């Protein structure tokens, strides 16, 4: 059964970025490893949320990313991530989905990533 998307729905996951994974990612993007996690490495978190599984195997396109970085994420530290489905709507022949990923440590927001995806396939069923 597919997960149903409703505006305002949210889900929580705990995670950590292991230093070796961050080192590898940094070498791929040409950044010197300094113990901090590059913000766009957080893209690997999206598939970990059940809410995002509606897109598994579907052709979606990322069209907008907004990152608000309040404090750097550090390797090998446990964080709490909250994924919120902000909005879904039909725009011309596309379905548009807006999600917000908020990453916290000790009840303090470290980073917010808002991303907009589109799909032509009508996977949401508008």
Swiss-Prot record:
InterPro entries: UCP032370_VraC (IPR016994). It comes from the Bacteria. This is Protein VraC.
């Amino acid at each position: 059964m597919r997960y149903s998307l409703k505006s305002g729905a949210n889900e929580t996951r705990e995670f950590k970025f292991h230093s070796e994974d961050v080192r590898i990612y940094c070498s791929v993007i040409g950044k010197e490893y300094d113990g901090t996690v590059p913000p766009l490495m957080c893209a690997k978190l999206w598939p970990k949320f059940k809410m995002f599984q509606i897109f598994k195997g579907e052709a979606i396109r990322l069209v907008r990313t907004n990152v608000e970085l309040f404090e750097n994420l550090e390797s090998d530290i446990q964080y709490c991530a909250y994924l919120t489905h902000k909005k879904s709507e039909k725009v011309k022949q596309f379905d548009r989905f807006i999600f917000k990923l908020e990453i916290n440590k000790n009840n303090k927001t470290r980073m917010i990533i808002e991303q907009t995806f589109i799909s032509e396939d009508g996977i949401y069923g508008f």
